[in-house]
């Protein structure tokens, strides 16, 4: 019997007394009166959702009410929708699932539109997050509505063929979502562990190849039941469920969950270890790259007269070293152990909580049918995995301030990013400065230069030239940069990240306010952060030509991506 037959009542034959079908707990297929119509019923599995047929004979005046009462003991408090009797509990479940689905769709759409409408968010890491959002959006829009319909009605009304397709798409989207989480964990480990080489390691072409491989693996896992790797088809077309064939249940559980879970746990544990060691190195003022003899020293150049109140060079040197270490920690904020532990607990904990119960029960129930949970418990476990697709947009993108700002702009219908002046907190206080100070990242030889003076091995970027004036060095824009009407700090295709601007702004406020007492021995009272440079020792090599790097791609110059 098709879904259309369930929603319709068939009338046949002339007027005469008729008998009713569908009595009892769901009824049977109905019977035909001597001269009356056939009455459609619903199998006993549908319980109180039976449809009562009526005739037109004299004996049928009270048959409708009697048969309806016999067909369902819960008719009172139920709603009839399209000829189907839906209980009040089913209506409540439907409303809850509808809100759940709409939340998942809206959250994943926000992630996709945020990256599409903001060029500064179009990075390789965010491409993986967008892929996660696409998988979750496809699951929310193409799978969950039919799953919710089956939960409300109590049976599958869409036929056997569509059931097989729905189950395959379900496995495809869930597997792609989990593999996307796995890919994000690997990408963030590479970004933290080898961040100086990250732009060369994780290019857009490699990212596209990884995403193509990800969907190929998900497709291989999902097409098994369509090719016959499943248990025998049940005779009742109104039943639709996941395949519990032993071999496929184990294969899909291992490929879709257990292997990705192992990778996720290992990668995030490594991220935490590397972040903690990096934080300790930054507190000491030196960051050592593994397997290399060179040292990377973060130094904050302060504009102004670097004179001590007492004129003691030794005291000035010691206090300057302390200031350098504290500023390094405040600038980078790479990985505070408590924050990293909290973030990792949320990421790994939510993933395991949502998916582990389902992938534990599925193979266990296939191997040992007597250990299967009850139907109600299995439904909760089944939808708990879907819940992960709803919370992913909250965990991963919302851990970034840039994504939060992009969400707010989208909600305010401000798709285009406003042109804001870079680092307004670093506006030069002296009239001799024509432009704002530049943030330069230059590899330098091992010897040190006096603070406040430019390195002899570094040249300014095109479009900016230095001149002496007032208490320090300023920047005077060239004619070409004025014609462009936009001061490009990092080149036409590179923009400083929001996190880095906020960090430098915080440092500037420290110099001017509460930290002035500690900073007065190293910087003038009105000094500001002029540059962040990398001191890289070169053994026997010539001076390194100044190169500009993307701050967001440099090791430890962005907040931890965990």
Curated annotation (Swiss-Prot):
Which segments sit on the Cytoplasmic face? 116-127, 187-207, 270-342, 400-562
What exactly does this protein do? Answer: This alpha-adrenergic receptor mediates its effect through the influx of extracellular calcium.
Known glycosylation sites: 60, 76
Q: Name one GO cellular component term.
A: plasma membrane
Q: Where is the composition biased (Gly residues)?
A: 21-44
Put simply, this protein is called Alpha-1D adrenergic receptor
Location(s), subcellular: Cell membrane
Q: Which Gene3D superfamilies match?
A: Rhodopsin 7-helix transmembrane proteins (1.20.1070.10)
Q: Provide the topology term for how it sits in the membrane.
A: Multi-pass membrane protein
Q: Which GO terms describe its molecular function?
A: alpha1-adrenergic receptor activity
> Subunit notes for this chain?
Interacts with FLNA (via filamin repeat 21); increases PKA-mediated phosphorylation of FLNA.
Span-the-membrane segments of this chain are 91-115, 128-153, 164-186, 208-232, 246-269, 343-367, 375-399
Q: Which chain positions have S-palmitoyl cysteine-type lipid attachment?
A: 413
**Entry's PROSITE patterns?**
G_PROTEIN_RECEP_F1_1, G_PROTEIN_RECEP_F1_2
Organism whose genome encodes this protein:
Mus musculus (Mouse)
Keywords from UniProt, A to Z, are:
Cell membrane, G-protein coupled receptor, Glycoprotein, Lipoprotein, Membrane, Palmitate, Receptor, Transducer, Transmembrane, Transmembrane helix
